[in-house]
Amino acid sequence: MNRRDFTFMLPIIALGMSLLVGRALGQQKPLTEQLLGTLTLVSHESVRADGTRTPVYGINPKGIAFFDASGHFIITVMRADRAKYAIDFSTQGTADENKATAQGTMTYFGTYSVDQADHTIALHIEGSSFPNWNGADQKRVFAIAEDQLTLTARALQTGGYAEVVWKRAN
């Protein structure tokens, strides 16, 4: 290829490169769209101010989160090692069984909104297994990397924060 051919080809190459870069940048979905779908729980930890981590729902917690396009969500987390009740009626557990259930399960649902600029999600909780959250608004910082969502929330009682890691369901 001589110099004249190269000079002619250079603008075409530059145009092609800019189109490829523009297309790649255009494929980055807004955070709200990246959040949509079903996620399974990886971990749910309390992180103290000194960095100490404690699993809130045990070593291998179970959970599912669902965020839909109309702005609704539901989140359920629980200990994987919960004992079964002695009888097969959920409303007739013993005091100890009911206590273990209350301490080993958290479910809440409502609507959500995303703030793209500060990477936060506001959860507008309509109902929760923990009654104090009914009607509450809670804000979480979130990060999305590939198929993983990490939510963090400040824990006022400990001075640390809660960190919940979710993975996109297959």
Please provide the spans of the model-predicted regions.
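Lipid interaction determinants
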Residues: 2, 8-170
